[in-house]
């Protein structure tokens, strides 16, 4: 099963990225294009998924983009690795829960290459780490499935501005924090994108 790998160097506007994903969704459904994995970085934006609530916005002055992905509200911006995808589950296993687990394993396995221990949480979607005795989210996941084609993706915090999360209740979870990789371990993460692509592609073929 062929997968197109796309990498964008310059930050991409959130709305432009979602438009491309939705166009690819239609093309895959019509048999015109192959699956897609897309690595990018966003311009600053707060995005709200289908289950967010107004009370999760602590600063009413922020600009908010509502989207049809699953999940609640989160922040995207420089220093964050975004991995979007459009994957036809009809060619694989038509099991949404297994696909979410596959995403979680992709992130966990990729970060383990940098000696960073992370884990999923059955009650709170995303990838977490225990840093100095506190549970913090290091990666957010948001997925939508249409006609058994999964799209949207996940975001890994590398060295982004964590103060931006003070304007919201990230992913609707108030009793846990948000962290980035640089705060966990100050090292070079420049090849994380390649590791993500390799691991994700391999997991999709299993």
From Swiss-Prot:
One of its GO terms (cellular component) is cytoplasm. One of its GO terms (molecular function) is lipoyl(octanoyl) transferase activity. It comes from the Bacteria. Coiled coil: none annotated. The active site is at 171 (acyl-thioester intermediate). InterPro entries: aa-tRNA-synth_II/BPL/LPL, BPL_LPL_catalytic, Octanoyltransferase, Octanoyltransferase_CS. Keywords: Acyltransferase, Cytoplasm, Transferase. In the reaction, the free carboxyl group of octanoic acid is attached via an amide linkage to the epsilon-amino group of a specific lysine residue of lipoyl domains of lipoate-dependent enzymes. Belongs to the LipB family. HAMAP family: LipB. This is Octanoyltransferase. The lineage of its organism: Bacteria, Pseudomonadati, Pseudomonadota, Alphaproteobacteria, Candidatus Pelagibacterales.
């Amino acid at each position: 099963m062929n997968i197109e790998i796309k990498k964008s160097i310059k930050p991409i506007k959130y709305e432009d990225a979602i438009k491309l994903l939705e166009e690819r969704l239609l093309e895959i459904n019509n048999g015109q294009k192959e699956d897609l994995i897309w690595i990018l970085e966003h311009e600053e934006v707060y995005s709200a998924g289908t289950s967010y609530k107004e009370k999760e916005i602590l600063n009413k002055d922020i600009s908010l983009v509502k989207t049809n992905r699953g999940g609640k509200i989160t922040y995207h911006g420089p220093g964050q690795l975004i991995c979007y995808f459009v994957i036809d589950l009809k060619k694989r296993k038509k099991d949404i829960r297994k696909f979410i687990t596959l995403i979680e394993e992709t992130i966990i396995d990729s970060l383990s290459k940098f000696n960073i221990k992370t884990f999923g949480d059955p009650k709170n979607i995303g990838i977490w780490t225990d840093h100095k005795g506190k549970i913090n989210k290091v990666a957010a996941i948001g997925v939508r499935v249409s006609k058994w084609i999964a799209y949207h993706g996940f975001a890994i915090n590398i060295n982004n501005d964590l103060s931006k999360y003070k304007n919201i209740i990230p992913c609707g979870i108030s009793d846990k924090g948000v962290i980035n990789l640089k705060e966990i371990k100050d090292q070079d993460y420049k090849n994380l994108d390649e590791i993500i692509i390799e691991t994700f592609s391999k997991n999709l073929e299993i």
